[in-house]
Amino acid sequence: MKVSLKAARVNAELRQSDVAEKLGVPVDRVKYLESKEGSAKITYEMLLVLCSLYGCTPDDIFLPIDYPKSEVSGG
């Protein structure tokens, strides 16, 4: 079952401020990425970083967009 970025963060027992600190961005940026509008604009590279923090894979995360197979598989 796929989860939202927010659910993945909560499952990892992290606060938005924890993630912001690890990424070196303002808390508002993390809030935006967790919003429907923000998650639709997230880059694959940022998704990989967040998944690393959350202990999951991009396949575990529900996003309102689909990345092309070549971008996901690297080829």
Q: Language-model segments: what does each one mean?
A:
Residues 1-12:
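A short, Lys/Arg-rich alpha-helix, primarily the initiator
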Residues 24-40:
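Recognition helix of helix-turn-helix/homeodomain-like DNA-binding domains
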Residues 43-49:
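Short Lys/Arg-enriched helix C-cap and helix-to-coil transition segments
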Residues 15, 26-29, 43, 57:
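Short coil turns linking two alpha-helices in DNA-binding domains
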Residues 5, 19-20, 30-33, 61:
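Conserved hydrophobic/aromatic packing and binding residues within compact polymer-binding modules
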Residues 8, 40, 52, 60-75:
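Short, charged recognition helix plus adjacent turn
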Residues 11, 22, 53:
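Residues within the alpha-helical elements of helix-turn-helix
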